[in-house]
């Protein structure tokens, strides 16, 4: 090296200068623009050309819902010749074939993708998936004495080199010559292997480097993830026995049965070395297992599948001999083409066992052949299957079926009589917001390329209405887009035609109300009619689901999900949440606890009762939406309308029946819903600073005890605040506090809040003349706990919100600065204090332990009406007093055992419940709260029986009011088993009344509790240095 000599093995450097002596001139810049990535890529499932960036969406929404593609095993699929016979590949093994060395990146049997432009603009199918050419094996003898060696793709620099480009072009040229020389059969079927697709994709390196759809492209390296070289030696070709088909599979006009023109496609999962999974929405898992006798058996795992026996009969000898003849007649160069195709069946035995093909197969068709079964998934997409499950569940129950009249039952019957495409489209439209939709904006290719006949069928059946029935100007204006509204505004010469959409809509509505200037001609249309006509002309064809059938299906969904939270009953969502739950359960991704459904009490007396409840539930949903959006005036108008409707219903006879229902069923009555609306009205009036009206509403709510008794504490507390703070009425405020403390429904935090307000009023100088009113107050005492103070660096931030702290992390060698919450600052402090374990879970930590220790009691049988459907995460009476009352002896016995149990027993009980119920959806259990079962067992060992039994008793007695306020942190030392329960308070934060009560209760149970105050260091306005 000192003499300036290069090393012997050093590769000669390539000059970077452009020299005239070079053999190959640099390509023109035009070639760069000619080789840009294509705008569309071929879908690996259905072979359609789709936009590059829509490939994921296409696979999820269209290919996955293609009913005509059914996964079956390759060894059950026969290649078909022109005579209609098929080759049975089930027991065919290609042996004694050792393909020669060949890199999959430098061989392809398909034309260059750039040639697709020459085939015409109208082409919508990738040339790689054309099924009009057959694969020809030529030179079988050559194949028997060669090894296949899969070479890795190499570095990026080698792929970009000119030498690599030249070699690739020469290989493509040879492949084109091979394709032109090979005889083709017009009736043959092309079978594409993943290796072929790898070659095609490699010819578009630029696509791989620039596209965002890399996960949908086959990769050659994944074929040989564990090994880089595969070879098969000393094998023999066995001839398969042929047999005649005993029965021909039935055909369907929509889903053709297995035939000679059925194309075969491979899933991308093959190239990743994974077992093939169906891309349909059925989530079926297909496995191939070999029995004792060597025969392959197909196993389908799914919630519900139909098995169809399909005969795969063929003349294997004739077809196989044809292949051998073609391979023997091929040239040596052409043998490479056979090698690529043979890699699929011969290169790797493990890969061969995972191959699954797709053929169109009609559901329900069958051909009787022994030991040959193919499981066909349900033909409907997931949303239609879930919708049908809901309909079946409701109308199979006599109590629910009686809530619909004959006309409504006929509507459901008509829906069942619709075609599959019409049912799919209706469910899609039903799940969308209830409004008019432009027909040219609807695009559901998985349903039908042209939706016009499907829409016509739905319109004729009475499920859809078209623009001919669109007569409301406000609805037409909402249908128009912003550019269309501006065009319409210019037509009518509005003052500000380029304004916002809502401003233009309001202007048009005001203009339509103006009287016409022309006084002659009474038959002349007014300005509103003219605007309506012009607007409908701009909107074009439109449609909307009819209100009548939609209301019927909405009530069906309401009955099906009656036990769900009423906040989820969004009128505009079309039951999306309920259908999603059904889907997840059917797919096995969601599982509810095991319990016995026991429905004894009828909630709704008749159809009108259900309709009133549904109307009130939708009104509550509309008011909640307006409040969430900050539209307080609109929310006030809606609440006043609801109040008027409720006043008309107060004398209805059905309300007396509702009053006698158990409390946990009374919440599904119309009176309960309107009471919740009036409670929301109080908040709306307070937001609008209408405190006088708010006080009247609160007094009206407190005057009844039938509905929402669990909210009485909040109502009393709010009434006292309005009278004391906002209206300055001291004597009524004191009387309110006295009555509130005497109310047995006022509990925990609200009771303490009222008592503390009374103490403040008693000490106030302005209340000296009312001190005699405080003599009858019941005393509420709460003990204090230990307080500690730590400091933390506050992150500079603007506006409101939780405080964010800056904390140093990492070791001395790799220091780092992280942003964290106030609870994480406290956890770091206690970690330095010797507590090696800690959880920030607030109430979910203790409710999870409560659910694990009392799981069998919470979901026990024998209690009527607490479990009314199969999708409940908790019993209906969990948050009522009847929960403890109906399970009193069992709960008392369990609490006694927990109180006196040693640590080993507690660990065993938690482990038994965890292992038996893990993953099931239960509202009180958060399975991700603990990192593992071991951590949960360690915590119960540290807490001990007395603390656990005391917490469980309080939660079981009044879960509604006691589930909140538990300490933020639980920290413990895994060696000494010392634990501490900590409530963390950041800057400008203080303890709530519920937190005070829980800290006092836990301290009485013997737990080490304390309040950790985190004081900020630094000002929010200052920046970090």
UniProtKB/Swiss-Prot annotation:
One of its GO terms (molecular function) is ubiquitin-modified protein reader activity. Zn(2+) binds at residues 43, 46, 58, 63. Its cofactor is Mn(2+); Mg(2+). It is an enzyme of class 3 (hydrolase). A zinc finger (UBZ4-type) spans 40-68. The modification Phosphoserine is found at residue 182. The keyword Transmembrane does not apply. It comes from the Eukaryota. Residues 903-1015 form the VRR-NUC domain. Residues 682-704 form a coiled coil. Binds 2 magnesium or manganese ions per subunit. One of its GO terms (biological process) is DNA repair. Its EC number is 3.1.21.-, 3.1.4.1. Transmembrane segments: none annotated. The keyword Manganese applies. Mn(2+) 1 binds at residues 968, 983-984. It holds the Pfam family FAN1_HTH. Ubiquitinated and degraded during mitotic exit by the APC/C-Cdh1 complex. Interacts with FANCD2 (when monoubiquitinated). Interacts with FANCI, MLH1, MLH3 and PMS2. Nuclease required for the repair of DNA interstrand cross-links (ICL) recruited at sites of DNA damage by monoubiquitinated FANCD2. Specifically involved in repair of ICL-induced DNA breaks by being required for efficient homologous recombination, probably in the resolution of homologous recombination intermediates. Not involved in DNA double-strand breaks resection. Acts as a 5'-3' exonuclease that anchors at a cut end of DNA and cleaves DNA successively at every third nucleotide, allowing to excise an ICL from one strand through flanking incisions. This is Fanconi-associated nuclease 1. It comes from Ailuropoda melanoleuca (Giant panda). The gene is FAN1.
